Structure formats: structure tokens, C-alpha cells
UniProtKB/Swiss-Prot annotation:
GO molecular function, one term: RNA binding
InterPro entries: Domain_X, Maturase_MatK, Maturase_MatK_N
UniProt entry tagged with the keyword Thylakoid: no
Organism per entry: Macrozamia communis (Burrawang palm)
Domain of life per record: Eukaryota
Protein name: Maturase K
Keyword Coiled coil: no
The organism's taxonomic lineage, starting at the top: Eukaryota, Viridiplantae, Streptophyta, Embryophyta, Tracheophyta
Localization: Plastid, Chloroplast
Entry function: Usually encoded in the trnK tRNA gene intron. Probably assists in splicing its own and other chloroplast group II introns.
GO biological process per UniProt: mRNA processing; RNA splicing; tRNA processing
């Protein structure tokens, strides 16, 4: 890989045109087998692995020689008769070839990403998911509409091959990739991203996730020049003017006056206010303008993807939400913008008067109903909140049972600490106490009342570490109940969050 990177710096076209010979190198299949063995160990027990599936360089050499004997084609090798594969089954060879193809496909893109991220170590500080919300808290209140885009997952193999042509110019490699994609269509066609990840874990290959991530990257990469055009237009900061409507009128008259009488070229006031956020299969575009402008944006985005990617994106996959009337779900929160009225006393030279100042405020709320539904899905309770005991945990010690329930509650509260209303979170804590007590009662074959009398207040006593509890108490004393705390050490989504 280091040699390829050095060659890539000298001649970037070399890494695009000579990928096919890499399919006949033993090292890439060793790397592929490493990935397969590591991923399989996390999903399947070791007892299920067959002794015939052990890796050896002799097997790889025989496989490569068999590929060469079949005129350099990979697909006949993948689809060959199982009786011809002495000592190994067909799935082993198929996974080995798919893994090698994935390793070779990642070569130009890994080099490209490494070059683009050189000298950008500060990106490591933005790994937290919750870093998205402070950005949205600053930008979304100044927007009127939200375009909620669901990236499609039903992708034709030929579209992926055409997308690869933008960066890979090796025709034999593209033909091999096309044949493999047409043969393994189930790796790239799924209803949602979670199902795609499940398929990838069962099939023991990274090809499906690599193809989807690359396709999603290409779909949004061409939108960056559009955002840059709007960013070059002059705009004024929001903090400078409380009431922007009269200011717009004054600027309009000034521009007309200077244009008529002074005949000078002036900068017009432009305020596009376009903000883009993406996580997994969802993209959020916040816009400031009228409903007609937002519909035009949806129309242009749909046509743009159809022309450049042959992607027939249905309009219903781009939702339009008006922030003043509706809320939208994103990363486990119900996000909305509410109007906040403040009483302001204005003092002038001879007089003073009181007026109302209306401002917009970002209002994230933890959806209690969805969180309870997640507990129902994990069989902690029913839809009415009636608790279920975890019979599979009765073989653990009391401390382990308490730690598991405590960890669930701590993760939920830690993730949703930015909610403006904490009542629903404390309700979740109360609901989780009941399955915990019932599990302990089943273990000791006693009543729930006896468990509560025995453990007392020790249930969920570890929900906060001491330093975090002191920080939270200090915030609660100095600030109101609606203050939000965004923890920056969250790098993955809460498993109980479904939206």
C-alpha cells in the first residue's frame, strides 16, 4: 500500500488504469481473508468454522492459477462447480474473491482520501455525533424550511459501474466489477441501511458497505460547488440586526437611489442561508425563503441526480417541513423552532416604552413515545409500560444485573441530555427500574416489594459518575430546567434510537 501511495503521488493516472493486475496478487487476498476472519469472529462462534476454511498461500496460488486458466475472468471462478473445488466449499472461494475485489477497489479511494486529509488533524475533534446539534442550534432558527432527503438504497449495478468510471479507467477491472455486481445483486439492493449492514455481516464482505458509502459520497460531492456559489454572495450577520424587515426596505431604497442617480455598481444584499447536514442515509438542508423557492430546490435536486447519476429519485423521498408549524425527527430527537417572546424596555432621550421582542429558539425534544417503543422492541416492557423480567440475565450476579440496567439508562440520558424537556427521560428511568426489580425478584424467587426493601435506593445509583453528577448539579443550580447540555464524547448513535 505504501508503494502504491508513492506511485500515486508521482502519477495519479497509474492508480486508475492498472488495477486489474492487482487481482492476481496474493497479498490482497491475504488482506481480504484477514477482514473476513475478523468480521466472522464477531458474528459467529468459533465452533461453527470448518477446518476446510483455513487459509493458506497454496490455496490462493491455486485460486489465482484457476482464474488465469479461465481467461482472466473472475465470475466463472465464482460460479464454478463445487465439485471442482477440492478441499474447500464454494462460499469460501466466493467470499475470498469478493474480499480481494473489495481490497483492490479501495486502493485508489484510500489514497485519494489520505491526500485530501493531510494536515487536517483537527477533524478528529469533530467525531462526536452531538457536534451536529450545536451547529443546527445556531443555523436552523434562521431558516424557514427543511428539506429532509432520504438517500435511496435500490441501486442498479450498472449505475455503480458508471459512477466508478469517474475515478477508475481500467476497463478490465470495471468489466470484472460489473460481472460480480450483477451476480451478487443482493449485496447492493436492500430496503434500508440497517438491512444492508445486516447483509454485509452475514455475507462476511465489506463490498456492500463500501459501494453504498462511495455512492452516497458521489451523490453529495457534486453539490458542494453549488453551496460555494451561494457562500460567495455577501450576507450580513444575524446578530447585527434584531428587526431585519425594515432594514431590507432601507437597503432596497438605497440601492435604487444610488443606481438611478450615482450610476455605480453596488453589492446587492443576498441572504441564501443554506445549511447542509448528513448522517447515514439522511440529509438535511435548511433553507431560508418562501415555499415556492423550496419547491424549486426540490425540483432541481431531483433533476440533478437524474441527469448525473441516472437516479430516478421519487419526489416523496424529499420531504418539505415548515419549521414554524411542524417538527422533524433526526438522530433520535424531535427538532423544531419555537417563537420566544421577551419583554424589552426601550429608553430614548425623553421617553421610554415597553415592547415585545419575538425571537426564534431551537427546541430539541427527546421523543418519549419512541423511546418506550424501543424498550418494547427489546422486550423490557409492553406498550402500556408493564415490565417484563429478563430471564436470560437471572444467571448473572446482582451487581451485573444492576450494572446492565444502569448502563442502559446512563446511555439514554447521556445521549438525550440536550433535550429541552427532561420529564420524559426521568419517566424512562422509572420504567427501567421495574424490569430491573422484576428480574432480581425472579432470580431470588421473591416478590418485587422484597427486592425494593433489600436494595432500597441502590437501584440505579451508578447512573452518574461522581464528577459528572457534580457538573450536572452545578448546572441545575445555576441554570433553569430547560438548559441543554451537549456531551461531545458521543461518537455513535444510541442503540435505542430508531430515527
Amino acid at each position: 500500500m505504501d508503494k502504491l501511495q508513492r506511485d500515486g503521488k508521482e502519477d495519479t493516472s497509474r492508480q486508475r488504469r492498472f488495477l486489474y493486475p492487482l487481482l492476481f496478487q496474493e497479498d490482497f487476498y491475504t488482506i481480504a481473508y484477514d477482514h473476513c476472519s475478523n468480521r466472522s469472529s464477531s458474528f459467529e462462534p468459533m465452533g461453527n468454522s470448518s477446518s476446510n476454511d483455513r487459509f493458506s498461500f497454496l490455496t490462493v496460488k491455486r485460486s489465482i492459477s484457476r482464474i488465469r486458466q479461465q481467461n482472466g475472468s473472475i465470475v466463472p471462478f465464482v460460479n464454478c462447480d463445487q465439485n471442482k473445488l477440492v478441499g474447500h466449499n464454494k462460499s469460501f472461494y466466493s467470499e475470498l474473491v469478493l474480499g480481494g475485489l473489495t481490497a483492490v477497489s479501495e486502493v485508489p479511494f484510500s489514497i485519494r482520501s489520505k491526500h485530501s486529509l493531510e494536515g487536517m488533524n483537527e477533524w478528529a475533534s469533530f467525531r462526536s455525533i452531538n457536534s451536529i446539534f450545536p451547529l443546527m442550534e445556531d443555523k436552523i432558527p434562521h431558516s424557514n424550511f427543511i428539506l429532509d432527503i432520504r438517500i435511496p438504497h435500490l441501486t442498479h449495478p450498472e449505475i455503480l459501474v458508471r459512477t466508478f468510471r469517474r475515478w477508475i479507467q481500467d476497463a478490465p477491472f470495471l468489466h470484472s466489477l460489473r460481472s460480480v455486481l450483477h451476480e451478487h445483486r443482493n449485496l447492493i439492493i436492500s430496503s434500508n441501511l440497517d438491512q444492508l449492514i445486516l447483509i454485509a455481516s452475514k455475507k462476511n464482505t465489506r463490498l456492500s458497505l463500501f459501494l453504498w458509502n462511495y455512492y452516497a459520497y458521489e451523490c453529495e460531492s457534486l453539490l458542494v460547488p453549488l453551496w460555494k456559489r451561494f457562500s460567495h454572495s455577501r450576507s450580513l450577520p444575524y446578530e447585527s440586526f434584531i428587526e431585519r424587515t425594515p432594514f431590507y426596505r432601507k437597503i432596497e431604497h438605497i440601492v435604487i437611489f444610488y443606481h438611478k442617480y450615482l450610476k455605480k455598481s453596488l453589492w446587492f444584499l443576498k441572504d441564501p442561508s443554506i445549511h447542509y447536514v448528513k448522517y447515514r442515509e439522511r440529509s438535511i438542508i435548511a433553507l431560508r425563503g418562501t415555499y415556492l423557492l423550496v419547491k424549486k430546490w426540490r425540483y432541481h435536486l431531483t433533476n440533478f441526480w437524474q441527469c448525473h447519476f441516472h437516479l430516478w429519485l421519487q419526489p416523496y423521498r424529499i420531504y418539505i417541513d415548515e419549521l414554524s408549524n411542524n417538527c422533524f425527527s433526526f438522530l433520535g430527537y424531535l427538532l423544531s423552532v419555537k417563537m420566544k417572546t421577551s419583554v424589552v424596555r426601550i429608553k430614548m432621550l425623553d421617553d421610554s416604552f415597553i415592547t415585545d421582542l419575538i425571537t426564534k429558539e431551537f427546541d430539541p425534544i427527546a421523543p418519549t413515545t419512541l423511546l418506550i417503543g424501543s424498550l418494547v422492541k427489546e422486550k423490557f416492557c409492553d406498550i402500556s409500560g408493564h415490565p417484563f423480567s429478563r430471564l436470560a440475565w437471572t444467571g448473572l450476579t446482582d451487581d451485573d444485573i444492576l450494572d446492565r440496567f444502569d448502563r442502559i439508562w446512563r446511555n439514554i440520558f447521556h445521549y438525550h441530555s440536550g433535550s429541552s424537556k427532561k420529564d420524559g427521560l426521568y419517566r424512562m428511568k422509572y420504567i427501567l427500574r421495574l424490569p430491573c426489580a422484576k428480574t432480581l425478584a425472579c432470580k431470588h424467587k421473591s416478590a418485587i416489594r422484597a427486592v425494593r426493601e433489600r436494595f432500597g435506593s441502590e437501584l440505579f445509583t451508578k447512573s452518574f459518575p461522581k464528577e459528572r453528577e457534580s457538573i450536572f448539579l452545578s448546572f441545575s443550580k445555576t441554570r433553569s430546567q430547560r438548559e441543554r447540555i451537549w456531551y461531545s464524547d458521543i461518537i455513535q448513535r444510541n442503540p435505542f434510537v430508531n430515527s
